[in-house]
Regions:
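N-terminal binding-site loop/beta-alpha segment at the start of enzyme catalytic domains
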Residues: 1-57, 116, 265
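Short, acidic/polar
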Residues: 11-24, 69-84, 137-140, 162
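CE4/NodB-like, metal-dependent polysaccharide N-deacetylase domain
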Residues: 73-94, 119-123
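Beta/alpha (TIM)-barrel catalytic core signal, keyed to glycine-rich beta->alpha loops juxtaposed to Asp/Glu
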Residues: 12, 97-267
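A short, structured active-site edge motif that brings together acidic residues
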Residues: 54-67, 88-97, 156-157
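Acidic (Asp/Glu)-rich catalytic clusters
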Residues: 44-54, 81-86, 143-146, 167-173
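Active-site mouth loops of central-metabolism enzymes
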Residues: 3-14, 63-70, 101-106
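Residues at the N-termini of beta-strands
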Residues: 30, 88-91, 128, 152
Length: 267
């Protein structure tokens, strides 16, 4: 699916279940979660009671940093799958690259973790495998050692954070780009240029940001627990951003970024 529903910071329990149900009601079929979000169980309950057949759903989860390595990743996957109440997962990602310390060591860690994903894929427990927050210098050594190349790279992507180098690398290697935080922070939604462009199309700034991701060949994963915003974020297929406006958005100064750099994170 070309549009997904993100669940980062989505509360566990009824609020989360209601949010996923609302997303399913509004046509989302791609639900993105992760072991680190602590809400896989909630997502699983919502899917089981959401009234949508399994074959129509596309479910993503991710292995966390403390479970890197071959055996630990296989164990972590089974824990995630049990919480989600699924026979298989549609997409499994390495959440963050190992990138600290000696280069040879972190490259080996990523390669061993990837080998576990390849095993899950070949065993039919995962339909697609990929990475998250990987830059080209993380991807290249992993790809050199891989039997199966990454199919997806999920990165922070929004106006003011256009990740051109990583997107171009992924496009060259047929790696699908997914966009977490496609709306950026509140500063993105308050940017006057984006407000003016959105007004010219009769859409909200949030819709403009999501549409920009789509037209930049990325799959946006907007998140919300507000029913109205969940619905609004799905209504992005009725307009096209012109090439001129796409370029104006591309050229925004850095804006609304999370500050999370895969080369320097310490979690």
């Amino acid at each position: 699916p070309c549009l997904g529903f993100g669940t980062w910071k989505m509360p566990d329990g009824e609020v989360g279940i209601d949010a996923v149900h609302q997303a399913l009601h509004d046509g989302y079929r791609h639900i993105d979660t992760a072991a680190a979000y602590d809400n896989e169980g909630t997502v699983g309950k919502a899917l089981a009671s959401g009234g949508i057949s399994r074959e129509d759903l596309f479910i993503t989860t991710k292995v966390w940093n403390t479970d890197r390595g071959y055996d630990a990743t296989l164990k972590a996957f089974e824990e995630s799958r049990a919480k989600l109440h699924l026979d298989y997962v549609d997409l499994y990602l390495i959440h963050w690259p190992a990138a600290q310390g000696a280069e040879a060591e972190w490259q080996r860690t990523n390669q061993e973790t990837w080998r576990a994903l390849e095993t899950l894929y070949l065993d039919g427990l995962v339909r697609a495998i990929g990475v998250s927050n990987f830059k080209p210098h993380h991807l290249e050594p992993l790809m050199d050692a891989a039997d199966i190349l990454p199919m997806v790279d999920q990165i922070e992507l929004h106006p003011g954070c256009n990740q051109e180098v990583t997107r171009e690398f992924c496009n060259r290697h047929d790696i699908v780009v997914e966009a977490w935080s496609p709306l950026g922070s509140g500063r993105v939604l308050e940017n006057q240029l984006l407000i003016d462009i959105a007004a010219s199309y009769g859409c909200t700034v949030a819709q403009l940001c999501i549409r920009w991701c789509l037209q930049r060949r990325a799959i946006p994963l907007p998140k919300s627990t507000d029913a109205g915003r969940i619905s609004e974020n799905a209504r992005v297929f009725w307009f096209d951003i012109t090439d001129e406006d796409l370029q104006r958005i591309d050229e925004l100064d850095p804006l609304g970024q999370s500050g999370l750099d895969p080369d320097t994170i310490d979690f």
